[in-house]
Amino acid sequence: MKLLRYGPPGQEKPGILDAAGRIRDLSAHVPDLAGEVLSDAGLARLRAIDPATLPLVSGEPRIGACVGHVGKFIGIGLNYADHAAEAGMPVPKEPVVFGKWTSSICGPNDGIDIPKGSVKTDWEVELGVVIGAKCKDVDEARALDYVAGYCVVNDVSEREWQIERGGQWDKGKGFDTFGPIGPWLVTRDEVPDPQRLDLWLEIDGHRYQNGNTRTMVFTVAQLIAYLSTCMTLQPGDVITTGTPPGVGMGIKPSPVFLKAGQMVRLGIDGLGEQLQSTRHAQ
């Protein structure tokens, strides 16, 4: 299934794409795509509904983040060896974990606000993993059983705040609008191997990132198992799993960063695309 949330910010309704790619309204069946709705049992109930029987959503509504009421938005850094090299950092021996504040979450096509005074706002296309069941101390072999589905994430980052101002990644990762998620939550049954997904990103039509999740340092299963040893993962938590090379700060001979008035387009095979305009934060 391809699940989504549509409507104005803070008023999103749950929906599903039908066979023709049209949005159907799920709000008569579930209040939101959040919490226990994302469990195996909750998704099985949605799967039993014939989308053709649901109300058709007219027009072109705003698409919100594909998960509501996210409890934890967990980032993984330097999870592609070639990205670590372009960043001038060693390949990690254990996952680099940081938090993205949930207030950074926005829809996949909402604008990106460049923070006041920023000259180092950067892009990162990433595979997002949505947890579907409470998860603590799980084995790698069973880790994917706890996944509800997958989505596209742009891990927008302000490099001065991330690296130069005390070295705390959280500070550079959590500005408002720095967490576009979606457009869809694609359930795990439709993604047989999360380590075989092409991902890409363009700025104003120029392709900067081309990668595949097979080159991750730590696989999705390894990340879930690792994180579950130091925290309890809950339904609706989102893990964004790192980016391939091609980010702005790694461009030679001179880094390239986002400016107001640009268009950012990114996507992952089978998971959809995002399109964001950049603007100065007010």
From Swiss-Prot:
GO molecular function, one term: ureidoglycolate lyase activity
UniProt entry keywords in alphabetical sequence: Hydrolase, Magnesium, Metal-binding
InterPro entries reported for this sequence: FAH, Fumarylacetoacetase-like_C, Fumarylacetoacetase_C_sf
EC number: 3.-.-.-
Gene3D superfamilies with a match to the protein in the record: Fumarylacetoacetase-like, C-terminal domain
Obligatory cofactor(s): Mg(2+)
Superkingdom in the source lineage: Bacteria
Annotated Mg(2+) binding sites: E124, E126, D155
SUPFAM superfamilies, sorted: FAH (SSF56529)
GO terms, biological process: urate catabolic process
Top EC category: hydrolase
Family under the similarity heading: Belongs to the FAH family.
Name listed for the protein in its UniProt record: Putative hydrolase BceJ2315_61450
Organism encoding this protein: Burkholderia cenocepacia (strain ATCC BAA-245 / DSM 16553 / LMG 16656 / NCTC 13227 / J2315 / CF5610)
